[in-house]
Amino acid sequence: MAAFTGTTDKCKACDKTVYVMDLMTLEGMPYHKSCFRCSHCNGTLVICNYSSMDGVLYCKTHFEQLFKESGNFSKNFQTAGKTEKSNDATKAPNRLSSFFSGTQDKCAACKKTVYPLEKMTMEGESYHKTCFRCAHSGCPLTHSSYAALDGVLYCKVHFSQLFLEKGNYNHVLQAAANHRRSTAEEDKTEPKEDEANPTEEETSDAAAEEHES
């Protein structure tokens, strides 16, 4: 039941309390799903077409216009407070560099590296935007059509079937456990680089033994 209780988190956009069923976390910031909008045009965003800078959300069209096409990041950079000290402007290139650089974060769905432009954080896990899918059916999710339990994502239809209609946590928790187990088994079947490719030392030792024989 704890998953449905209120929180003290405040929405980054409207500054009102965010409850768990309406919560989405992006770039470490809590939002209402309904507040997931471009800060420039106020257009509704979906998971597969948003970009962000320091927690401020944009549609890809305006992100391109403001950051890529203009070539002036400090001028167009919008912060939550809309004001920065002059010496902070010199840090913009560093922010930009870290924004576009690689990370060590792994996608919870495919286990591959997630780069910032394709990264979203939901329920404490990092995902590629294209990997944001229902764990039960694999159908694509949007910010307004997902539900989660124990960090596993579902479309609302299957979450309803597995949890709300049956009124049984065990059923949906079992589905989550099966999902994690299948992911772990897939990881085990992938050969490790050290096992698949012998080192130069191992190759030279084998050649020496063959020569001696």
From Swiss-Prot:
Give one Pfam family, short name only.
Answer: LIM
Q: Which SMART domains match?
A: LIM
GO molecular function: any one?
metal ion binding
- UniProt biased composition (Basic and acidic residues): 182-195
Q: Where in the cell is it found?
A: Cytoplasm, Cytoskeleton
One GO cellular component term? cytoplasm
Q: In which tissues is it expressed?
A: Exclusively expressed in pollen grains.
State the source organism's domain of life. Answer: Eukaryota
State which residue ranges cross the membrane: none
Which parts of this chain are annotated as the region Disordered?
Answer: 177-213
Gene Ontology BP terms: actin filament bundle assembly
Q: Which residues form the LIM zinc-binding domain?
A: 9-69, 105-165
Q: Which PANTHER family match?
A: OS06G0237300 PROTEIN
Any extra remark in the record? Answer: Cross-links actin with a constant of dissociation of 1.5 uM.
Domain writeup: The C-terminal domain (159-213) is required for the ability to respond to pH and calcium variations.
Q: What name does the UniProt record give this protein?
A: LIM domain-containing protein PLIM2c
> What is the phylogenetic placement of the source species in the record?
Eukaryota, Viridiplantae, Streptophyta, Embryophyta, Tracheophyta
